[in-house]
A protein has these predicted regions:
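Extended, non-catalytic subsegments within catalytic or DNA/protein-binding/adaptor domains
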Residues: 1-318
Length: 318
């Protein structure tokens, strides 16, 4: 009997471990961060956060709306609350009418227009590369930053994908470079896929050439591709962070004389998709590079790129 109890306890522990690993660590951290805000709301108002009740969740959504929180953030918080309940073995009906009807009302009152971060378009990127070349910085640091930005743009990378690259993920071929993405936001089970980045005609802005230059000068043979510098521009073997990418982008955008307030690490990815759409690339070829599973976001980039193409007003002669 004791052995049976021990075995069941072991199975329960393994099951909980499986549940905790059903999502990526980044996703799990995001869930916990969102739930902490909900937990704080519950503590302040004398509610129980785990397990909770649909009516309490609905009140929380109204509270977020009153704080002028974006619709996309409110939706994400709702998903996080439901997901953590499920992972802890509690049932929470996030489709309950008191939640759904309230959320629909919030959307109608607030509107759902999204003002995302600005895309870093190809001409902006070229301007940044020119600025980097003129900086009074060690050559090795300039090479890293150019390779980081050009590869990030050309591959339509998410920040986490970019900083997670290791030397064993890269293969230089006649046509350019193949880069293996072992795991991504839309590939939770690590099936992986490969991005192919061809040579650019202008070597100054060629991601393949600049990546080679960086690897040759840094002499990196294994481990992280994009690493940090210590004080005195001494190379380390410590991987860059997500935040580092955003800070590098914003810093150089500012140095070009452009207002950097609406740019982020995501600007490389959205910039690639928008620039590719402007150049006439098909939806499926953009998705093949970015790894998008849904067409919704890609079509938003294409719509933005086509604002002045086939514009009805251009047919009117004034």
């Amino acid at each position: 009997m004791n052995k049976l109890v021990t075995d069941i306890k072991k199975l329960q522990d393994e099951t909980l471990n499986n549940l905790n690993n059903s999502k990526s660590q980044n996703t799990f951290r995001a869930y916990k961060s969102d739930f902490e805000d909900f937990g704080l709301f519950c503590v302040k108002n004398g509610f129980k956060s785990m397990p909770t009740d649909p009516k309490i969740v609905s009140l929380y959504l109204t509270f977020l709306s009153s704080k002028n929180i974006k619709i996309s953030t409110i939706k994400r918080r709702l998903v996080s609350i439901g997901a953590l309940h499920k992972m802890k073995g509690h049932y929470l009906d996030t489709k309950h009418p008191v939640i759904i009807e309230n959320f629909m009302g919030i959307k109608r009152l607030k509107g759902v227009s999204q003002t995302g971060k600005k895309p870093l378009l190809i001409n902006d990127l070229k301007q940044i590369i020119d600025v980097i070349n003129k900086q009074n910085e060690p050559d090795i640091k300039k090479l890293r930053n150019k390779a980081l930005l050009l590869i990030g743009f050309a591959g339509g990378f998410r920040r986490h994908e970019l900083i997670s690259l290791n030397m064993e993920d890269i293969e230089f071929v006649f046509e350019g470079v193949k880069i293996i993405i072992k795991r991504s936001k839309t590939d939770q089970f690590g099936e992986g896929f490969t991005k192919g980045i061809p040579h650019f005609e202008n070597y100054l802005y060629c991601p393949v050439k600049n990546l080679k230059n960086w690897l040759n000068m840094s002499k990196i043979k294994k481990g992280p591709v994009f690493v940090r510098f210590s004080k005195g521009s001494k190379l380390t073997d410590i991987r860059l962070t997500d935040q580092s990418v955003a800070l590098i982008i914003k810093d150089y955008i500012k140095k070009t004389g452009i207002n950097n307030a609406n740019y982020s690490g995501h600007s490389l990815r959205s910039g690639f998709a928008t620039s590719a759409a402007e150049a006439g690339a098909e939806e499926r070829s953009i998705m093949a590079m970015t790894g998008h599973k849904s067409t919704e976001m890609v079509r938003r980039y294409i719509k933005e790129a086509n604002l002045f193409k086939n514009n009805a007003l251009s047919k009117i002669k004034i």
